[in-house]
Amino acid sequence: MSVRVRLAPSPTGNLHIGTARTAVFNWLYARRHGGQFILRIEDTDRERSSPRYTRNILAGLAWLGLDWDEGPIYQSNRIARYQAVVQQLLDQGLAYRCYVSEVELEAMRAAQKAAGKAPRYDNRHRFLTEEQRRAYEAEGRQPVIRFKIEEPLEVSWVDLIRGPITWNTQDLGGDMVIARADGYPLYNLAVVVDDIDMGITHVIRGEDHIGNTPKQILLYRALGHEPPQFAHSPLILNPEGKKLSKRDGATSVAEFQQMGFLPEALKNYLALLSWSPPDGEEIFSLEKAATMFDFDRVNRAAARFDWNKLNWINSQYIKQLSPAELVERLTPFWQAAGFDLGSVPDPTWLEEVACLIAEGIDRLTEAPPLSRFLFQEPLSYSLPALEQLRLPGVAEAMAAMATTLAAAELPQPVSADSLKPLVEEVAKSQGMKKGLLLKSLRAALTGDLQGPDLMASFALLQRRGWALGRLEAVQKVVA
């Protein structure tokens, strides 16, 4: 039997990080077993579904590189199929028309709450006579369709992550609605029909769906099909153990992309949320993970989102990029910061800038502020940098550095090593400690006291033709 799994997001919001983790698990399991990964868009909620959310979901999955084998299949294109199944269940006496109004349902729930009971539908319209049905219809009532749930009955399955689970039908809230009054199907019915028609063998989803599973198993049986195997992965919580929310920084894949995370790093981290590879490695491609993925190594406990770990993983992937790849990934962020990339000396210069700052960043968004001094002229100075330049003897030392630089015959292209003797010469001629000179040189060239490697930065600025001017500008800056 070929493994067939599916990801079935609802386009009622952007691609959530929890859905992305579910997508990763489905993709890994399908690839591990040489199966198929199907994408289904569950867009039957006409009030909340939106094409822009569908586009966001598709774009997010594509950015992550989670390729699907079939789909996207849209539930909204299959309404007639669901309605035919509803009619089949009605014809078989397994479902019925329920005319209970919303007001009556609210009164029923209020009475149950007052009696200390859990709210549930009391199946009051399961055995209506034809005369009673006609009377309700004469009132203008439009019925929903409810599926009969026999009670008491135990529904059991062996969850591939959580082990044996048993649910009593008395805890399912009574006969469930499977179609609205307008004929549109509800979630549990549409999901079961789709999974049957698409030959889904394994349903891998979040544990928040466990309560739907017994209802769906009953529908599978009513339709004459064996249910697929289920695997319910633990939820993703914030570092404090609470539900992940906007307050935690980001919840959608698009936000992580905008924050400067690489898709390879985010996939890697999502795979590690509740799962661990047998070799204990933390940096791996999804293709490698697919050779090791197994539900036996998925933890049942809720996963806590660890920003520090994600940042570290992302930094490792940034360091692995080639110079050309670094430039490609950084370009959108540089452009968003307003940097003119067309005015740089040459492509090699841009690659060297990328490699220089890659060592000091966890996210791509950190690159523009760290490299701003290499792209923007005139230079702006931080207050600590100005204070450094105003120290006794510093302005004179920078003037000497400018004179020495202007007179030097430097090999082309200028390198950090070719500039180091000039620094030694000025430190000696000015009687200044090298540490003080270097700190002052950083302030003069970069406008700050912290940043990437100073001599490499010096060389890049010299190749751009900006180093001499910045050294000469110190006298005016401190005046």
Curated annotation (Swiss-Prot):
<dbReference type="GO" id="GO:0004818">
    <property type="term" value="F:glutamate-tRNA ligase activity"/>
</dbReference>
<keyword id="KW-0547">Nucleotide-binding</keyword>
<comment type="function">
    <text>Catalyzes the attachment of glutamate to tRNA(Glu) in a two-step reaction: glutamate is first activated by ATP to form Glu-AMP and then transferred to the acceptor end of tRNA(Glu).</text>
</comment>
<comment type="similarity">
    <text>Belongs to the class-I aminoacyl-tRNA synthetase family. Glutamate--tRNA ligase type 1 subfamily.</text>
</comment>
<keyword id="KW-0030">Aminoacyl-tRNA synthetase</keyword>
<dbReference type="InterPro" id="IPR020752">
    <property type="entry name" value="Glu-tRNA-synth_I_codon-bd_sub1"/>
</dbReference>
<dbReference type="GO" id="GO:0005829">
    <property type="term" value="C:cytosol"/>
</dbReference>
<dbReference type="InterPro" id="IPR049940">
    <property type="entry name" value="GluQ/Sye"/>
</dbReference>
<dbReference type="GO" id="GO:0006424">
    <property type="term" value="P:glutamyl-tRNA aminoacylation"/>
</dbReference>
<dbReference type="InterPro" id="IPR045462">
    <property type="entry name" value="aa-tRNA-synth_I_cd-bd"/>
</dbReference>
<dbReference type="Pfam" id="PF19269">
    <property type="entry name" value="Anticodon_2"/>
</dbReference>
<dbReference type="Pfam" id="PF00749">
    <property type="entry name" value="tRNA-synt_1c"/>
</dbReference>
<dbReference type="InterPro" id="IPR008925">
    <property type="entry name" value="aa_tRNA-synth_I_cd-bd_sf"/>
</dbReference>
<protein>
    <recommendedName>
        <fullName>Glutamate--tRNA ligase</fullName>
        <ecNumber>6.1.1.17</ecNumber>
    </recommendedName>
</protein>
<dbReference type="InterPro" id="IPR020751">
    <property type="entry name" value="aa-tRNA-synth_I_codon-bd_sub2"/>
</dbReference>
<keyword id="KW-0963">Cytoplasm</keyword>
<keyword id="KW-0436">Ligase</keyword>
<feature type="short sequence motif" description="'KMSKS' region">
    <location>
        <begin position="243"/>
        <end position="247"/>
    </location>
</feature>
<dbReference type="InterPro" id="IPR004527">
    <property type="entry name" value="Glu-tRNA-ligase_bac/mito"/>
</dbReference>
<comment type="subunit">
    <text>Monomer.</text>
</comment>
<dbReference type="InterPro" id="IPR020058">
    <property type="entry name" value="Glu/Gln-tRNA-synth_Ib_cat-dom"/>
</dbReference>
<dbReference type="GO" id="GO:0008270">
    <property type="term" value="F:zinc ion binding"/>
</dbReference>
<dbReference type="GO" id="GO:0000049">
    <property type="term" value="F:tRNA binding"/>
</dbReference>
<dbReference type="InterPro" id="IPR033910">
    <property type="entry name" value="GluRS_core"/>
</dbReference>
<feature type="short sequence motif" description="'HIGH' region">
    <location>
        <begin position="9"/>
        <end position="19"/>
    </location>
</feature>
<keyword id="KW-0648">Protein biosynthesis</keyword>
<dbReference type="InterPro" id="IPR001412">
    <property type="entry name" value="aa-tRNA-synth_I_CS"/>
</dbReference>
<dbReference type="InterPro" id="IPR000924">
    <property type="entry name" value="Glu/Gln-tRNA-synth"/>
</dbReference>
<keyword id="KW-0067">ATP-binding</keyword>
<feature type="binding site">
    <location>
        <position position="246"/>
    </location>
    <ligand>
        <name>ATP</name>
    </ligand>
</feature>
<dbReference type="GO" id="GO:0005524">
    <property type="term" value="F:ATP binding"/>
</dbReference>
<dbReference type="InterPro" id="IPR014729">
    <property type="entry name" value="Rossmann-like_a/b/a_fold"/>
</dbReference>
